[in-house]
Amino acid sequence: MNKTYDAIVIGGGHAGIEAAYALAKRAFNVALITLNINRLAMLPCNPSIGGSAKGIITREIDALGGMQGYFADLAMIQIKMLNTSKGPAVWSLRAQIDKEKYCQIILDDIKKQSNITLIEDEVVDLIVNENQCHGVVTKENGNISAKVVVMTTGVYMNSRILRGTDIKYDGPDGEKTSSSLSKNLMKYGFEILRLKTGTPCRIYTDSIDFSKVEKEQLDKNELSFSSHSNVKLDEQTCCFLTHTTAKTKEIILNNLDKSSLYSGIIIGIGPRYCPSVEDKIVRFQEKETHHIFFEPETAKGDIMYINGLSTSMPESVQDQMIASIPGLEKARVQKYGYAIEYDAINPLNLYKSLESKTLSNFFSAGQPNGTSGYEEAAAQGLIAGINAANKLDKMPMMEIKRSSAYIGVLIDDIVTKGTNEPYRMLTSRAEYRLLLRNDNVDERLSQYAFENKMISAQSYNKVLDKYKLINNEIQKLKDEYVSSNSELAKKYNVTSGVSKLKLLANPAVDPKDILGNDFPYLDEITIQVRLFGYLKKQESAAEKMFRLEKLKLPIDLDYNLVENLATEARQKLNQIKPTTIGQASRISGINPADIQMLMYYLNNRKK
């Protein structure tokens, strides 16, 4: 077996797959070391990709040359656009995925990649010399050397599965866990966090009484995540809606002392925005019911994922809870819900490139950085992979602005503010969310992708041509006026002197009446025109912030030398080592007076 590679990726989950593909796309030889090569990119938590904000992240991954959206399209059994009753800033795709097909597609495809080598093994330590990472130590194959290492271990570091007092030292779904790596990371200066997540039970579909639940109504559509998958679903697989009952609430409250979460067995901190059912019952006791969704795990549909019933209760209590829910009175359980605790590193140790501040050539991505979700993991894996490749190519690190992508918001948040709970992306976290829409990911990110060798010149020019066509059409509409005796004027009560552009800006107007059925980018141009004033305001605000991002801070700056800084500011700046004034301004506890002192200090240094 080869023992030397350009790059090593530790872990074959969603982050690891993106990192490996990014490095391979850049023509580097990659060793992808994972505990089970037949379980690549598992979907152990839920059988879906996307969701509010998350779907936009998957689209951003695609625009940057990543793979998640492409593979999701190939394995999806349902897709829909969320939040369509609201403004386009929060429209986001969500797809139900055939979880077995998804893993198989990725395994088959990765085996075709000549410069990715799959190695089934456990990484137990790093090879480190003078604060530089030079490879990994594995349990079965010993030392494997590389110029860069990307850690994407998911929830597998020192993980344990909990149901009541029943504890198993396993990874998700009974997979192996990695018991040594996080312990060894501490000796290289990493602070280890203990976090928690969970998953609900799975039920055999033929044991569900569907007469007691509500079937989701879905229209056929031509939606997809990827711009190059060319996949359109012929048929949508439906989900179903039911709810907890007063009996469910009673069972949970009477058995709280048996929950791993409430009995004190769990020490890890769980995700705030994805609570267990017992957590929901306790926190929202005024509510008598909570929504429960049945989601098929595969195209076969023989197993249902019971969304909304995540729990760490013992199996006997779960049986009672399940039987109290309409439609599940006689349900047969395929797998019980559980909580999982795992180790992660403090992401304040990382630069925006996702390279460690204390261990050169070592990058980290995904859940070991304190985030939750397949989409957040894949996004970080892609950025870490691109920047690891940039390091090998001696190119500048790629740092995506907050005003350019949710991915930029995600990474800036975790490396600037840190986290003590699994971080989930929300639209509310983005101050420029009108700019970060589902429809314009290619416009926002294609230049990043092209400059970092992730898409071809042909692909990049195709995007430039698209927006040139849109801008030309906008100018044309601006110059064309609606004739007072035209059908258009009669339909919309238009008097003379109204341009077609102004008419298109009216939400009551059907864009096809102005642009026809054949204009290829109907949604994009309509959104641009109707949000024009709001977009200009956000672009102006983003530009002001970007001026602060241009003011670089030296990595080796000793903030004890900066006069008149508050003590808290001095401590946090020395810990986080922000790279720009803009990043420094977003650290909690840093106030405007501290920023003024920093800028004054920088100006004096230049003199």
UniProtKB/Swiss-Prot annotation:
The keyword Flavoprotein applies. The keyword Mitochondrion does not apply. SMART domains: GIDA_assoc_3 (SM01228). Its cofactor is FAD. It is found in: Cytoplasm. Keywords: Cytoplasm, FAD, Flavoprotein, NAD, tRNA processing. GO terms for cellular component: cytosol. FAD binds at G11, G12, G13, H14, A15, G16, V123, S178, Q367. InterPro entries: FAD/NAD-bd_sf (IPR036188), GIDA_C_N (IPR049312), MnmG (IPR004416), MnmG-rel (IPR002218), MnmG-rel_CS (IPR020595), MnmG_C (IPR026904), MnmG_C_subdom (IPR047001), MnmG_C_subdom_sf (IPR044920). PANTHER family: GLUCOSE INHIBITED DIVISION PROTEIN A, PROTEIN MTO1 HOMOLOG, MITOCHONDRIAL. Belongs to the MnmG family. This is tRNA uridine 5-carboxymethylaminomethyl modification enzyme MnmG. It comes from Metamycoplasma arthritidis (strain 158L3-1) (Mycoplasma arthritidis). The gene is mnmG.
